[in-house]
Regions:
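Structural signature of tandem-repeat unit edges
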Residues: 240-242, 261-268, 286-319, 330-343, ...
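Consensus positions within tandem repeat domains that build extended binding/scaffold surfaces
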Residues: 323-325, 345-348, 425-427, 446-449, ...
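A structural signal for leucine-rich repeat
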Residues: 277-281, 310-314, 370-372, 495, ...
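Acidic glycine-/aspartate-rich tracts in secreted/extracellular proteins
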Residues: 67-70, 83-86, 122, 164-167, ...
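Short, surface-exposed linear motifs at loops/turns and structural transition points
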Residues: 33-238
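K/E-rich alpha-helical interaction surfaces of small helical-bundle regulatory domains
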Residues: 112, 119, 537-553
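Boundary/junction segments of secreted and surface-exposed precursor proteins
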Residues: 143, 238-253
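Sec-dependent bacterial lipoprotein signal peptides
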Residues: 1-32
Length: 556
């Protein structure tokens, strides 16, 4: 009986343990079966995240998306709006495997917006959580630092930048200014041409005191208030500085004809050069003006292409003093050319009756003379110029062998440098020198060298063989001429219209000449002029063609 009881207990224990084992196996099988039955395509898990980079009108919307299984990335967008309906959409762009963003613009300032991330595969739409952000409020305008663009003795052009309108339309902008000695007494000048745009602004302040120090503040106004920028200091002076070409007339304003002396720096285009001519007494249509500018220093100026013609037909060229640029400027007496000048064209200063001095810069490589500068007394040249030199106010080439430009107003007597070997055409035309002495090494003269000059007496080079055509034509004050021993020929009109009283000829044989060589209009020099010839040569000259017309051939 006892054994049976023990046996019964053991069987119950075995049965219980077997049942538990079977249950565990069944559970494992069941779990395994559930995992293998999980679907391959699941809805993405999307989350709306906080907005960033929020301004008055823009914001960046952020979100995340988690893809499970073999689900493809759906099409995603952000819905947003000022109500929970969120009627506006913006395409979301994936920045990595899980993050998406969208930059939205055109928002209203100080406004709360609702937004959420939304995904769709064309059949099903999944929405994320809804969030909000608030745009920044509008502000007063923001300004950059002011600067001086250009200035004159009584005016200044100020430049400044409106960097931000603050989200509101700017209603007014300009500058405040005051004498530094009384900074609280500020004058306000509003821009009359303001377009309403942000960015670079310029403003002219005129009617300033000469040689005075000012404080200048830029300002801008909107519905949100007025912003006044940091002040800059500016002192007026006698010089004018252009930051941009074409501003000379604007800077001068009503004082255009008030200046007699002026220094100008900066770029000058055709518009500026036309204005400069007007200041010197010559208008755009070549008529006289009330301009009185007589002394101008352009050392720090720079001639640049652009603008309208400076004289009605000719345009400015970079670093070129063009033909007619200063022509007929009746007020001009002295000019220093821009230091970067490379070319001075023919007749750039034509018919400037009071121009006395011209300064040639180091950079000049080509200089041509101007006619009609009756008062021109001297031409100076920078010592650094490698193409020209100035000697006694006369412009010569670099090795001083050729005269380039002889100033018409130079008076008295003049002896040419011994280095000069030739003289070009019309070199002394219309000049005021009364007595000329040539070095004997000059062998050639150009045509019309002394035409219409005021010379009274001249000694020709001893080695000169030919007196060219029109050499002294129109020299109505020429009375005495000395011809060298090697003179062989006197060309037609060489002494035409010259009231000669004495001709000295050192040549043993009479130079070839004809009646036209001494052709005159008026006085008959053949009966009044004395011809002085070498001793023992009187009869030879009296028998020679051309010379025999003279009634007074003598020997000293």
């Amino acid at each position: 009986m006892a054994w049976r009881n023990v046996l019964s207990i053991s069987l119950r224990q075995i049965t219980s343990r077997l049942s538990w084992s079977l249950c565990v196996v069944a559970l494992v099988v069941s779990l395994s079966s559930c995992d293998s039955d999980k679907p391959d395509n699941l809805e993405p898990l999307i989350t709306t995240l906080s907005a960033t980079d929020i301004t008055r009108t823009d914001a960046t919307l952020n979100g995340s998306v988690v893809i499970e299984g073999e689900t493809e990335m759906p099409q995603m967008c952000f819905r947003y709006g000022i109500t929970e309906e969120m009627k506006q959409t913006a395409t979301a762009v994936s920045s990595d495997n899980s993050s998406v963003t969208a930059r939205i613009t055109g928002l209203s300032s100080a406004t709360t917006y609702y937004y959420m991330l939304e995904a769709t595969n064309g059949r099903t739409t999944v929405k994320g959580n809804m969030m909000t952000f608030t745009t920044l409020p509008n502000e007063k305008p923001s300004l950059g630092e002011a600067s001086i663009v250009s200035h004159g003795p009584m005016s200044v052009i100020v430049g400044y930048e409106i960097t931000d309108d603050g989200g509101e339309a700017i209603t007014e902008t300009g500058c405040l200014y005051a004498l530094a000695s009384d900074a609280e007494d500020r004058q306000r000048v509003a821009s009359k041409d303001y377009s309403g745009d942000k960015g670079r602004q310029t403003l002219l302040l005129s009617g300033l005191n000469r040689n005075a120090t000012y404080l200048i503040w830029p300002y801008a106004k909107s519905r949100m208030g007025e912003t006044v920028g940091s002040p800059i200091t500016f002192t007026t002076g006698d010089a004018m500085s252009l930051g941009e070409a074409g501003q000379l007339r604007l800077l001068l304003g009503k004082e255009l004809y008030d200046y007699t002396k002026l220094s100008i720096a900066g770029p000058l285009n055709g518009d500026d050069l036309c204005c400069l001519r007007e200041m010197m007494g010559r208008g755009f249509d070549n008529t006289a003006t009330a301009g009185r500018l007589s002394d101008v220093d352009l050392t720090d100026a720079r001639i640049v292409a652009g603008g309208e013609p400076y004289d009605g037909s000719r345009y400015a060229v970079d670093n070129v003093v063009g033909q007619g640029l200063f022509a007929d400027c009746a007020s001009l007496t002295k000019v220093v050319l821009p230091s970067g000048t490379t070319t001075i064209e023919k007749d750039a200063f034509a018919r400037c009756p009071y121009l006395q001095n011209i300064s040639i810069p180091a950079s000049a490589t080509l200089v041509l003379p101007s006619a009609g500068c009756s008062a021109l007394q001297g031409i100076s040249v920078s010592g650094a110029n490698s193409h020209y030199i100035g000697k006694d106010g006369v412009l010569l080439n670099a090795d001083a062998t050729r005269i380039v430009w002889f100033p018409m107003g130079k008076s008295g007597s003049y002896t040419l440098p011994s280095t000069v070997t030739s003289i070009g055409d019309y070199a002394f035309k219309e000049c005021s020198i009364e007595t000329f002495t040539f070095p004997d090494n000059i062998t050639t003269l150009g045509t019309g060298v002394f035409m219409n000059s005021k010379v009274k007496e001249v000694k020709m080079p001893g080695s000169l063989r030919l007196v060219p055509t029109a050499t002294f034509q129109g020299c109505t004050q020429l009375y005495v001429v000395r011809l060298g021993s090697k003179t062989e020929m006197i060309s037609d009109y060489a002494f035409s219209a010259c009231p000669l009283t004495d001709i000295y000829v050192d040549a043993q044989l009479p130079p070839v000449c004809k009646s036209l060589s001494f052709g005159t209009s008026g006085a008959n020099i053949f009966s009044s002029c004395r011809v002085h010839v070498p001793k023992g040569r009187v009869n030879i000259y009296k028998a020679s063609e051309g010379w025999k017309l003279f009634k007074n051939i003598i020997t000293d």
